[in-house]
Amino acid sequence: MSTEDKMATDDHYKTLEVDRRASDAVISAAYKALVKQAHDAKDEERWKRLNAAYEVLSDTAKRKKHDRTAADSIKRGKVIGDYRILEQIAEGGFGTTYKAEHRLTGKLVCIKHASHVSAHDEQILLDEARSCWDLRHWGIPAMRDILRMPDDSMALVMSYVPGPTLAEVLEKKEYNNGLDAEHVAWIVDRTLNILKYLHFNGVVHGDMKPQNMIIQPEDHTVVLVDYGLSKVKPTRKDGALGYTPFFASPEQESGRVPLPESDFFGLGKTMIFALGGDVEFIKVPEHTPDAMCEFIKHLIKQDPLARPNWQDVDLCEEFRKIRKACFGRTFSNMKPLKI
């Protein structure tokens, strides 16, 4: 094993007596205090361990590699509580997501390991989980459990939802130029129904984007994932923001807490993306029906107070009228998308 790999597998957080989610300032302060103790005690071996640990944890790239090595210890077949890990399916700003199965029932679940969440925000995460605990809707995964992982961080257990994301669908060759407007319409119709349920239950999604929309084309169904995490900020230093540029609302980018209207902004940007438009420069394809263009314009206004809100308008009903005006029907009889 190389010196670098050895450094990546040592428990440097334990050496510096800090939590794995500690800030750079806390790590620096702990290092200075412990090095002084080692120096005063003339403990050369401890001094070397402290320096090795600080060398890794004070460097963003090395710390990231160290954390990834620890996360990689959660392999296929590992048992955590009542669940057996099957595979890693995603990695994002909050941590790693795994597909797992319940050991007794064999039911599939999704475990969201919040490894990049601070100790302070873990309490916020717990509060958010409580608010989502009893939510039941065909368009959102159900909250099943909360776990403590081997590294003492928190993980949310949710029902597993199969299917590609909207982003993955749009990566297919036949959809490189965007989806047919009527396909986008049924996706938006389903998404508005889900958002209405979440918002009326006091939950803001906070990261509306194609990557968080699972498409089940045979049933013309959409499932929103990663909901209810809008108040939790990731601790990673590698660009993770807790929201997604180009899809995030101006208020989120300025650091404010997202609102229901923030979800509408993200939905509007997602519509542009799905239609084959330019999300960055907000250009909608020319073939898009005028009524859908106007709907998008209302959703993506810079001022959240200028966007629609549920108190003034039922967006579900409004969009069904738009579907009727654009396509002559409110329910699509189109063939399923090819996935």
Give names to the regions the model predicted:
Residues 86-93, 97:
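Protein kinase glycine-rich loop
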Residues 151-165, 169:
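Conserved short submotifs of the Hanks-type protein kinase catalytic core
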Residues 118-134:
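AlphaC helix of the eukaryotic protein kinase fold
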Residues 187-188:
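Activation segment signature within eukaryotic-like protein kinase domains
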Residues 142-154:
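Short beta-strand micro-motifs within the conserved protein kinase catalytic domain, predominantly
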